[in-house]
UniProtKB/Swiss-Prot annotation:
Residues 174-184 have a biased composition (Acidic residues). Residues 154-173 have a biased composition (Basic and acidic residues). Pfam families: Med11. This is Mediator of RNA polymerase II transcription subunit 11. The lineage of its organism: Eukaryota, Fungi, Dikarya, Ascomycota, Saccharomycotina. GO terms for molecular function: transcription coregulator activity. The gene is MED11. Residues 142-152 have a biased composition (Polar residues). It is found in: Nucleus. It comes from Debaryomyces hansenii (strain ATCC 36239 / CBS 767 / BCRC 21394 / JCM 1990 / NBRC 0083 / IGC 2968) (Yeast). GO terms for cellular component: mediator complex. Component of the Mediator complex, a coactivator involved in the regulated transcription of nearly all RNA polymerase II-dependent genes. Mediator functions as a bridge to convey information from gene-specific regulatory proteins to the basal RNA polymerase II transcription machinery. Mediator is recruited to promoters by direct interactions with regulatory proteins and serves as a scaffold for the assembly of a functional pre-initiation complex with RNA polymerase II and the general transcription factors.
Length: 184
């Protein structure tokens, strides 16, 4: 039993070690960013200092981009390893299977509605029209009621069309029954 635990811990430990290395790279990235800002904010008095500062900024920027690249590559590798091991147990040497998780879809229409409301509000601010907040709410309620009425009318029309179609089918089947009776 302890051999199985050791093999289980190997795969898990490898993943943890890899994520730790990525975490260290992120810390290094943040350190490089802070040193870049420090170099940028330090005033230089002579032209020699300015060229030195430019060289430092180039080197630090290069370090930042290298760190970002290394972090992105490391995360992609980890995601790939995780994806390969979801739902199967024979993809890694330790026979570990990662169970799939279900991710529920969030309500994305709410964000769109809020965005549209914000855009309307910004348009009123930009155009300089003063509108009362209660007036906007009343207009919004009226628009919502109109949309609801339109939806109800559409559903009523669909119901009527369905009823008509059913009645037509009944009539045609009754006519077929009469024709069958006449033949018999």
């Amino acid at each position: 039993m302890s051999i199985e635990k050791e093999s289980t811990n190997n795969f898990v430990q490898e993943r943890l070690d890899s994520l730790y290395e990525i975490d260290c790279k992120i810390v290094s990235l943040l350190d490089n960013m802070s040193s870049l800002f420090q170099t940028y904010s330090t005033p230089k008095s002579s032209d020699n200092d300015l060229t030195e500062q430019k060289d430092q900024m180039k080197a630090q920027t290069k370090n930042i981009y290298n760190a970002i690249s290394n972090v992105a590559i490391g995360l992609r590798k980890e995601v790939k390893i995780m994806d390969e091991n979801i739902g199967v147990y024979n993809k890694n040497k330790d026979g570990i299977m990662i169970l799939p998780i279900s991710v529920d879809q969030k309500n994305t229409t709410l964000g769109t509605k809020k965005l549209n409301d914000e855009i309307k509000e910004l348009n009123t601010i930009v155009t300089g029209e003063e509108t009362d907040g209660a007036m906007n709410d009343t207009n919004m309620e009226a628009t919502t009621k109109q949309e609801t009425n339109i939806n109800n009318e559409d559903s009523e029309k669909e119901k009527q069309e369905n009823i008509t179609a059913i009645e037509t089918k009944k009539e045609s089947s009754e006519n077929e029954d009469e024709d069958f009776d006449m033949i018999a």
